[in-house]
């Protein structure tokens, strides 16, 4: 159990959105809350979670636990991306491209939170279409998952990294 707590201490956690939803029943309305969170180690591991509960703290806790369970690795290149990438989920489309040192994270809203916890320090990013936070987060993670490192490309093609980089 101590190992899990130590690991959780290393993770950065960000709350992106809390939403109140209602269900109308015969006796009135029943309110419920949803929370969207992202967690990352700041070094290429990132995950997101979506939790629902009757109370806000419970929804946030559920979302954090789901985010920790759904973590994936992202191949970064000195705090930026390997190459320009696109990601999409339903009506949201995102475009991200690597940026030079000192640029910072030029991205809005939900995208910025994902990139910060993933450990990306310099990136130019733009969200197109729907800016629904859930879909933007999913599209951003889709784009990061589609990114390939030179080592991955070299292994796939059966060539050396030097041949790939030219």
Curated annotation (Swiss-Prot):
Gene3D superfamilies: 3.30.160.20, 3.30.230.10
S5 DRBM domain segment(s): 11-74
Molecular function terms, GO-annotated: rRNA binding; structural constituent of ribosome
GO CC, alphabetical: small ribosomal subunit
One example of a Gene Ontology biological process annotation: translation
InterPro entries: Ribosomal_Su5_D2-typ_SF (IPR020568), Ribosomal_uS5 (IPR000851), Ribosomal_uS5_bac-type (IPR005712), Ribosomal_uS5_C (IPR005324), Ribosomal_uS5_N (IPR013810), Ribosomal_uS5_N_CS (IPR018192), Ribsml_uS5_D2-typ_fold_subgr (IPR014721)
Coiled coil, from the record: none
Keywords, alphabetical: Ribonucleoprotein, Ribosomal protein, RNA-binding, rRNA-binding
NCBIfam families registered for this protein in UniProt: rpsE_bact
Classification via HAMAP family: Ribosomal_uS5_B
PANTHER family per UniProt: MITOCHONDRIAL RIBOSOMAL PROTEIN S5 (PTHR48277:SF1)
Domain statement: The N-terminal domain interacts with the head of the 30S subunit; the C-terminal domain interacts with the body and contacts protein S4. The interaction surface between S4 and S5 is involved in control of translational fidelity.
Complexes and interactors: Part of the 30S ribosomal subunit. Contacts proteins S4 and S8.
Stated family: Belongs to the universal ribosomal protein uS5 family.
Protein name: Small ribosomal subunit protein uS5
């Amino acid at each position: 159990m101590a190992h899990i707590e130590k690991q959780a201490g290393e993770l950065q956690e960000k709350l992106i959105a809390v939403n109140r939803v209602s269900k109308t029943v015969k006796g009135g309305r029943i309110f419920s809350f949803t929370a969207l969170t992202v967690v990352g180690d700041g070094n290429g591991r990132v995950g997101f979670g979506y939790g629902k509960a009757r109370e806000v703290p419970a929804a946030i806790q559920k979302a954090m636990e789901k985010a920790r369970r759904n973590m994936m690795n992202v191949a970064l290149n000195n705090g930026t991306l390997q190459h320009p990438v696109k990601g999409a989920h339903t009506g949201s489309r995102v475009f991200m491209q690597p940026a030079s040192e000192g640029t910072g994270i030029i991205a809005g809203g939900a995208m910025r939170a994902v990139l910060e916890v993933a450990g990306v320090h310099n990136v130019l990013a733009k969200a197109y279409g729907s800016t629904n936070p859930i879909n933007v987060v999913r599209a951003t993670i889709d784009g990061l998952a589609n990114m390939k490192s030179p080592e991955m490309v070299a292994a796939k093609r059966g060539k050396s990294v030097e041949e790939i980089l030219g």
